[in-house]
Amino acid sequence: MSLIKIIAITGMPGSGKGELAKLLREKGIKVITMSDVLREKYYKEAKEGERLMDFAKRIRELYGKGAVAKLCIEKIGKEEIVAFDGVRNWEEIEEFKKIGNVTIIAVHSPPKLRYERLLKRGRKDDTLTVEGLMKRDWEELEMGIGNVIALADYILINDSTIEEFKSKAEELLKRIL
């Protein structure tokens, strides 16, 4: 497999990673949402009553911290450019570097705004209390997401309207695609 162009999207829950992924899809770029790939495995292999976050930790303990990235790589196909939405740790970046040239984009939003978004989003595995959301943030940070955000090539600030975020994202994508 020759080297491909990889866009690694990272950010805390509710930061706007999905909105950036949507823009990339609109440009015809294949986006693989890492949590969807993980959920696929979770529904097949999770223990009775096991939370998705606990399943993710267990998978990484069994197969290494880059385990979810390896599962995602299998879904690339023949694409020359692909985006991975939801990179959680540096080991995943290292897996992606084995097959492509990686550009990391971190999406950042203030916690209060992210919590509001997550409460509105209502995804099945989203917790519905501020305390639960704060706990999830710490679990993400323990997984290593802070290192990926800190070492990102670009940081998109998402603290205003969706229109303003899309405009900033479009400008960035023009430069890197």
From Swiss-Prot:
Disulphide-bonded residues: none
Alphabetized UniProt keyword annotations: ATP-binding, Nucleotide-binding
Any GO MF annotation of the entry: ATP binding
A Pfam family this chain is assigned to: AAA_18
Domain of life (superkingdom): Archaea
Residues engaged in binding ATP: 11-18
SUPFAM superfamilies listed in its UniProt record: P-loop containing nucleoside triphosphate hydrolases (SSF52540)
Family that this chain belongs to: Belongs to the UPF0200 family.
HAMAP family attached to this UniProt entry: UPF0200
Protein name: UPF0200 protein STK_09500
Organism: Sulfurisphaera tokodaii (strain DSM 16993 / JCM 10545 / NBRC 100140 / 7)
